[in-house]
């Protein structure tokens, strides 16, 4: 094979696998282009990294093609083949969110597959909001953050962004040291995702984005859900009302509410024997004691209650709110093992203590 033909083959391989030509194997192949060099020595680690990169690139290409086909079916541009009624969806792991599907697993319905276009739009909007010094009235949710991280993980082009944001999961650490090639790759990924000119994206923008995501990941709001029950009617009321009037007015609607989640009878807790994963999970939840979780839940209940009172123009009575915690106080009081448990129970039930003097009739 001539040097020109060999160069064309290497260039064709570069365009398919590594267009920026950043892998370490390319400089080691250049001596083959010289006539006096008929052999080349390759490092084993470099060759293994090259093969792993090729395999990962091929797998991501297959996943992107499948996502494009699934989005085409979800958009109604193709005929969807009805799945048999007896077919059951593939069981999804409870904890391992990023696990790839098994090749032998049954095919899922098209509406359950991931639409990568929607994930990309969510990632672009959120990174634009956290990177640039601009204001936006858009309301972002926790699902947007999850969709952003899933997209960055699945995409080979933006995987460097995921690696950078992954360093903020544990604590507020400094940005890791990067070479000039890694910095250029990261900046190119941000420019490509945001579709912004090169003059507005620099390393300072990346630092702002990383610190913003760090505050987002370590925020207690990301760990506890916030539930607000609102009506479909107007949210403002001119006349001041009371809690009793609201219960009478909304009683029928509250009774008609149905649960939105259910558990199948055959659902089982999956067994996980990955010791490293369990250690990382325990390290993550260890700094958060149970009392702190209850405190955050009570704090969320308080703010949710105040928002509902404000929306309904209802008079706030502190005793109505304290009724929520009376049951917990009684449980804590009777959990203490002492000799006065029976007397306290009688007092709680409205019965006098057996040691007290009884009134004779």
From Swiss-Prot:
Pfam families: AcMNPV_Orf101. It comes from the Viruses. Its main location: host cell. A motif (Nuclear localization signal) lies at residues 357-360. It is found in: Host nucleus; Virion. Residues 32-36 are annotated as: LXCXE motif. Keywords: Host nucleus, Late protein, Virion. Coiled coil: none annotated. GO terms for cellular component: host cell nucleus; virion component. Forms a complex with proteins E27 and p78/83. The interaction with p78/83 mediates nuclear translocation of P78/83. Interacts with protein Ac102. Interacts with IE0. Belongs to the baculoviridae C42 protein family. Plays a role in host nuclear actin polymerization by recruiting p78/73 protein that is capable of activating an actin-related protein 2/3 complex to initiate nuclear actin polymerization. This is Protein C42.
């Amino acid at each position: 094979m001539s040097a020109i033909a060999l160069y064309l083959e290497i260039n064709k391989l570069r365009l398919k696998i590594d267009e920026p030509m950043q892998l370490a194997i390319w400089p080691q192949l250049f001596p083959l282009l010289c006539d006096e060099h008929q052999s080349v020595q390759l490092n084993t680690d470099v060759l293994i990294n090259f093969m792993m990169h090729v395999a990962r690139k091929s797998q991501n290409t297959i996943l992107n093609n499948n996502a494009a086909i699934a989005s085409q079916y979800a958009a109604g541009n193709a005929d969807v083949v009805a799945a048999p009624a007896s077919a059951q969806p593939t069981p999804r792991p409870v904890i391992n969110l990023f696990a790839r599907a098994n090749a032998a697993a049954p095919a899922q319905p098209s509406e359950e597959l991931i639409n990568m276009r929607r994930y990309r739009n969510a990632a672009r909007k959120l990174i634009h909001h956290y990177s640039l010094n601009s204001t936006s009235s858009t309301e972002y949710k926790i699902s947007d953050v999850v969709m952003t991280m899933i997209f960055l993980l699945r995409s080979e082009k933006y995987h460097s962004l995921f690696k950078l944001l992954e360093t903020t999961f544990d604590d507020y650490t400094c940005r890791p040291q990067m070479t000039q090639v890694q910095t250029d790759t990261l900046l190119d990924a941000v420019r490509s995702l945001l579709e912004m000119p090169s003059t507005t994206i620099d390393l300072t923008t990346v630092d702002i984005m990383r610190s913003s995501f760090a505050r987002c990941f370590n925020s207690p709001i990301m760990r506890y859900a916030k539930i607000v029950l609102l009506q479909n009617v107007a949210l403002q009321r001119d006349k001041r009302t009371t809690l009793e009037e609201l219960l009478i007015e909304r009683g029928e609607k509250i009774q008609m509410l149905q649960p939105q989640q259910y558990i199948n009878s055959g659902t089982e807790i999956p067994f996980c024997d990955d010791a490293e994963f369990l250690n990382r999970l325990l390290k993550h939840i260890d700094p958060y004691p149970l009392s702190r979780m209850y405190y955050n839940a009570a704090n969320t209940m308080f703010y949710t209650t105040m928002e509902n009172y404000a929306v309904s123009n209802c008079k706030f009575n502190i005793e109505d709110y304290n009724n929520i915690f009376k049951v917990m106080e009684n449980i804590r009081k009777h959990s203490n093992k002492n000799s006065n448990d029976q007397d306290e129970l009688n007092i709680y039930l409205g019965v006098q203590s057996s040691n007290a003097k009884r009134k004779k009739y």
